[in-house]
Structures are given as C-alpha cells and as structure tokens.
C-alpha cells in the first residue's frame, strides 16, 4: 500500500511540473533510487560494502547505447538486455571477489569501474550519442513529453521496490541479513553463505544494469566518466546510507532528498562552486554518520519504537524451565554418533590440538574441560568445519566430515553455539531461530513452526518478537541453543553456554540442556563451571596443551591427580577432600 501511495503521489507531481529541467530531475530520481536499491541488495542486506556498482551501471548504459547505434535495437529490448549484462557482470565479479572481506572487498570492487572506464576510453567510446529517431519515438523512447520519462522511471522503481520487498520477506533476504550480522554464525546455522552472496550480487548487478540502461535513454549521451566514474558508485552508496541501509525505503528516501538538492544547486551555483554535487553528497554522508549512523529510516524507527515501548506495559521475560524432569536414562553402550580420530591442528609453531581421539555415544552428555588454551574451542571448530584438521578424521556416523563446510556439517546434523554469543542482533528472536530452521525445513511456513517449537523448548517463545540485541546474557545463551536446535541436530555442540550466568540462571540453562538430552539429542559441552558440569554430564574428556589428558566418569575425573594439578587446582582438592 505504501509503495502504491508513493507511486501515485510521485506520478501526480510530474503532472504539475512544466519546466523540462525539473522534469529531467524527476526522471533521474527514480534511476538513482533503483541504483541505491541495487547497492542495498548486496551491501545493505549482506554487509559487503561495494565501491564498484558503477561497473554494472556503466555496462548497462553502454549496452543500450551500443545496441541502438550498431543494431538499431529498441531500448524496450535494450534495457532488459542491460539487466542481463549487469547480472552476468555481477556473477563474474562476485566469484573471485567474495574471497575477500571487509575493506579489502570494498577496494577490490572499486577497481572494476575504474578499469572499465579506461577500457571504454581505449576502445574509442569517449562519447556515444544515441541517434535521434523522431519517426519512431515510442519504439526508441524518445518522447516529446518528458513526463513519460518520469512515469517510466517510476515504473522501474516500483518494480525494483516490489522485488526488494519480496526478497526482504523471503529466505533469501533473511539469509543475507544473517550473513551481514554474523557470517560465521550464519554458516554454522546451515546457510550456504557464498551461494547467497553470489545470488545477491547477481540480482544487484541486474538492477544496476537496468538503471544504467534507462539513464542512457534519458540523457541520450554516454561517456565513461559519467557512467563509470567514482561519483556514480558514491551516489549509489550515499543515497542508501543516508536513507538507511538494509531497508526497502532507505535508498528511496536518500534519492528523493539528495538528488533534487544536488541537481538544483548545480544548476544555480555550478558556475560559482564547481563540483557542488559532490559537496552535497559529501556533506550528506558526514551528517548522517554524525547524527544518524544507520540512516534516516532507522533513526526514525528507533525513536518511534522507544516511544511505543515507554507506553506499552512491561512484557514478561523468559519463562523459566525449572520444573522437575524425569530421570534421564543413561546409555553408556549406545551407538557412536560422532568420533574424532587422531585429529591434530597447528597454527604456525603452535600445536593447538595434538592427536586427539574422542567418541560420543547416542544420547549422552559429554563434557570437555581443561585450562584456558587447552584447545577446547579449536576442537569444536574442527568438529563443525570452521577449520580443517592437519591430520585425522572427523566422523559423523562413520561419514568423514573433515574438510566439509560448516553449513554442510549443520545440514548433516551437527548444531553449534559459540563461546562469545553471536546473535543476529538486528533480527527478532523468532527470525534468529527461523534462520536456523531453514537448513532442514520443507518450506518457510514449516521453518516458522519449527522455530516456534524450538523457542518454546528453551522458554523464549514469549520473547519471539523482541529484537535479539535487547536480550539479557542468559536469554542470548538460550537463543543460541534454540537456533541450533531448530536445525534438528543429532549432535549439539555447546561452547561455554553457562559463561557469565548467575547461579539461578545456570540452573535454568542446565534444565534446558537436560530436557534436550532427555529427548535423545546427543550433547557435547565445553564449560568451566565445574560444580554444574559434575551434575550435568555423563562423562568427561580433559584436554591440556592440546592433548588428551584424561577421560572418564565425573567421579573419577574429579579425583584424578593429573586433572587436579593441570586444571582443577588445590582449592578443588581441599574443598572436595
């Protein structure tokens, strides 16, 4: 409804504008809004900041211009072709460039339009003028009434907004946001991060290519600096950042505010202050960084949300799960679900894991303990694919998982939490867990049902619509368990799930873990809270300096002299004498 209302209002605005220059401005505003949406699809949702969207924009512009000049191709066909060229360029660019992260990715993206600028100049395309076709004005989009350009640009923008809206609400959009929030956690939850990023840059390239193609039709002249120049990429980035990254309306807000302002100032003051358009965008980005770092949309939304929260009654917090549980039947002779066989891993001269072998049986709770730096988290990273062992095997029901990606191991049935909690903070509690459910869900509706069930099991169903970033430490720990649980794991790896919790909170989380184990889920837990671990686990594995120090029942391990000397310490010996 909002999109329709915006389209009607913007379309009617063109009716009341007579001056051709202002109609031109009204026509290019949607073009830059589409460019902002294209940038946003990649950088706003997935978090991979691009300084190179001018590459797709310029290729689209030259595609339309060259096709019309050499083959007489109508822009009605040329613009879809420009979108295809942009999509192909996005895929070709993405395959090697996604090997990079952070500012390395951004700088690599910057290289593509700069290279293309010189390539097209070298090819002799310093300035291409689209041939005039007055006798076939409609076929070649050369209208005497410039309002038609406004309405066509608006139609393209509405299409891009509808597409973005569909992406935003789909598995595609949720996966991209999860990647933006925490790529490692997303992959551990079963998301094929590279595949989704390639889809994002392909779709982003298509939108940018279409925008470039229409831009060429409106201006009738294409030059390398105008379509491949740094200001093109900067405008796409700035209109999105000004309005709000990772949102449908952010790029539209940015384009509606900044494009008319920069163009009008350029017309009025361009002779006095050359390059004033760049000044406008520069001031805009500085202002938004200082006053609204996430953009106008998020600033307004946060203000409205805070006001509503102040008026609303305080909702009940996590429902504690401390009811009496049926005694869990231990099965020391159960089938082996997971096995680490002679695994070793070194980082330079440091051997973090040395020839470690452990077996985990179906339905048991195995505790892994040891001093800091013993190799516990490294072992977990070997078990769920974040690092590859230098030697040895990682076996899930006799299938070797060594070298598999975390999303593959998650899909095979291994869930994981992290030592430092890694929620998707800008997503709701329910959305966090839905992301974890996607890996084995039959449909989006099924993923939601599975997520709600997982939240109910950990006592967070009442917090489903709350932003994950507002949860307490205990709730975040439970949220990670729920997200891992939503993937229907056979083996659950819990990395210091009790860290930072008070005594009462520890009991609540232990109750949840016991409940899951009673359902037949096999659990391996790393923890330093020994009093709780002794009551929780069936068996201990003790690591020290990367090697296996001891293995056995809790009552045996807590009396083992070597374990006391290496880890538990004299206080434990005295307290339990």
Q: Where on the chain are the PLM-derived regions?
A:
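Glycine-rich phosphate-binding loops of nucleotide-dependent enzymes
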Residues: 333-339, 343-577
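Transmembrane alpha-helices and adjacent helix-loop boundaries
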Residues: 1-318
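Polar/charged alpha-helical tracts
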Residues: 15, 305-306, 320-323, 447, ...
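Intrinsically disordered, low-complexity segments enriched in polar/charged residues with Gly/Pro
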Residues: 20, 26-28, 83-85, 127-129, ...
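General structural signal for alpha-helix termini and helix-helix connectors
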Residues: 94, 267, 325-329, 342, ...
């Amino acid at each position: 409804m909002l999109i329709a209302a915006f389209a009607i209002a913007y379309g009617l605005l063109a009716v009341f504008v007579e001056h051709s220059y202002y109609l031109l401005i009204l026509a290019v505003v949607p073009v830059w809004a589409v460019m902002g949406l294209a940038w946003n699809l990649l950088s706003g949702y997935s978090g991979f900041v691009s300084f190179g969207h001018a590459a797709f924009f310029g290729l689209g512009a030259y595609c339309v211009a060259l096709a019309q000049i050499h083959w007489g191709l109508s822009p009605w066909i040329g613009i879809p072709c420009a979108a295809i060229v942009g999509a192909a360029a996005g895929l070709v660019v993405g395959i090697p460039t996604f090997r990079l992260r952070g500012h390395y990715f951004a700088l690599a993206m910057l290289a593509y339009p700069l290279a293309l600028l010189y390539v097209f100049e070298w090819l002799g395309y310093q300035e291409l003028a689209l041939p005039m076709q007055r006798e076939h004005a409609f076929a070649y989009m050369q209208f005497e009434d410039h309002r038609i350009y406004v309405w066509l640009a608006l139609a393209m923008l509405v299409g891009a907004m509808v597409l973005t809206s569909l992406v935003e609400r789909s598995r595609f959009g949720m996966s991209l946001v999860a990647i933006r929030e925490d790529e490692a956690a997303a992959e551990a939850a079963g998301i094929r991060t590279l595949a989704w990023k390639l889809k994002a840059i392909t779709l982003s390239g298509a939108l940018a290519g279409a925008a470039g193609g229409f831009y060429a039709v409106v201006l009738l002249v294409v030059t390398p600096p105008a379509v491949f120049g740094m200001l093109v990429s900067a405008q796409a980035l700035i209109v999105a950042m000004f309005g709000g990254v990772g949102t449908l309306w952010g790029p539209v807000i940015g384009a509606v505010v900044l494009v008319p302002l920069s163009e009008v100032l350029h017309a009025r003051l361009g002779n006095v202050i050359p390059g004033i358009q760049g000044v406008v965008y520069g001031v805009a980005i500085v202002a938004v960084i200082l006053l609204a770092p996430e953009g106008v949309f998020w600033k307004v939304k946060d203000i409205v949300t805070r006001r509503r929260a102040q008026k609303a009654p305080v909702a009940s917090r996590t429902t504690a799960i401390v009811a009496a549980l049926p005694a869990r039947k231990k099965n020391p002779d159960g089938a082996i679900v997971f096995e680490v066989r002679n695994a070793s891993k070194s980082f330079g001269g440091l051997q973090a894991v040395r020839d470690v072998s452990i077996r985990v049986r179906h339905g048991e709770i195995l505790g892994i303990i040891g001093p800091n730096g013993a190799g516990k988290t490294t072992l977990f990273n070997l078990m769920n694919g974040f690092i590859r062992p230098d030697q040895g095997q990682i076996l899930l029901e006799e299938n070797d998982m060594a070298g598999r990606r975390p999303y593959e191991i998650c899909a095979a049935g291994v869930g994981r939490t992290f030592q430092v909690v890694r929620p998707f903070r800008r997503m709701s509690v329910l959305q966090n867990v839905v992301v974890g459910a996607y890996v084995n869900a039959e449909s989006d509706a099924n993923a939601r049902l599975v997520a709600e069930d997982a939240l109910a099991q950990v006592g967070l169903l009442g917090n489903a619509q709350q932003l994950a970033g507002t949860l307490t430490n205990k709730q975040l720990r439970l949220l990670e368990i729920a997200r891992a649980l939503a993937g229907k794991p056979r083996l659950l790896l819990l990395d210091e799930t009790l860290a930072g919790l008070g005594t009462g909170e520890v009991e609540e989380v232990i109750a949840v873990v016991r409940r899951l184990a009673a359902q037949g889920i096999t659990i391996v837990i790393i923890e330093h809270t020994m009093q709780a671990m002794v009551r929780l686990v069936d068996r201990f594995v003790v690591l020290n300096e990367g090697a296996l120090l001891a293995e056995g029942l809790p009552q045996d391990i807590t009396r083992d002299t070597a374990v006391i000397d290496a880890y538990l310490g004299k206080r434990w010996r005295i307290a339990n004498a």
